[in-house]
Amino acid sequence: QITPERIAINLDDARLADNEGVIRNDVPIVVGGPVAYESTLPIKEFVTAINGAGVPAAVSLSAGAFMCNHIFYVAQDRLKGTTVRSGFVHVPLMDEQAGEFPGLPTMSLDQMVKAVRAMLEVL
C-alpha cells in the first residue's frame, strides 16, 4: 500500500549501511534540531483520494529511522519557516522487483501512477 508519513524523527538508527557504507546508530540527524517534524502535506486527504482511485493506502505514523526518515527530516528542517509544503510518501516495490526482494510488498506501476495523480489532484 501507499503510505504518506506523518512524522520525521531526528534520529538515525540503522542496522544497515547507507550507500556510502556508513552505519549510523542512535545519532541525531541535525544536532540540536527538534525531536520531530510533522508533514506539511494533507496526508489524510491523500489517503482518501488514493483509496478513492482504487489503490490501497494508509497514513503511517513514522518513516522509521533509516534513509527515508533521514530524507524526510532534512527536507522538513530545510523548509521550516517557508510556505513550501513537504513530506514523504512511501511506495512499495514495483511488481517486477519481487524476485530481487522476496517477501517485500509490491504494486504495479499503473497503481502507483494512479496514487500519485490522486495526491496531485488534492494539492
Q: Can you annotate each of these PLM segments?
A:
Residues 1-62, 68:
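Mid-sequence, gly/pro-rich, charge-dense loop/helix-turn segments that line enzyme active sites
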